[in-house]
Amino acid sequence: MNAPQWLGAEGEKIAARHLAAKGYRIVARNYRFHRNEIDIIAFDGEALCFIEVKTRASLGKGHPAESVTRSKQKEIARAAAGYLASLDDPWITCRFDVIAVLALSIDERSIRKYEIEHIKAAFMVGDKG
């Protein structure tokens, strides 16, 4: 696993712990539908949340959430449609969230110190904005 992959995987672990501590019920991690992936799928009460996690070691290339481009949003939406097609409830409430993790202190095995921001309803499917 190269450094960016490792950093991303560590950020996803941090995000999953954050969600669990907030009472979310995680139902899938790294869900793949064709070539598209959703980092975390979890229930926040009755709402099914499709969560993209972005992790960076500095703000040199901008805030982590800024890297969730329109193209990436479309990929997430395609994977979400695949996941929803497998469910029995066609009327389930859904939400697309982004969790941004900024690693402030890293050693060879883990991110020691970080900032985390959970952006609920970060984007909407079909949103032209």
Curated annotation (Swiss-Prot):
HAMAP family the UniProt entry points to: UPF0102
Species of the source: Chlorobaculum tepidum (strain ATCC 49652 / DSM 12025 / NBRC 103806 / TLS)
Any Pfam family matching the protein: UPF0102
GO terms assigned for molecular function: nucleic acid binding
Family affiliation: Belongs to the UPF0102 family.
InterPro entries: Restrct_endonuc-II-like (IPR011335), tRNA_endonuc-like_dom_sf (IPR011856), UPF0102_YraN-like (IPR003509)
Protein's recorded name: UPF0102 protein CT2262
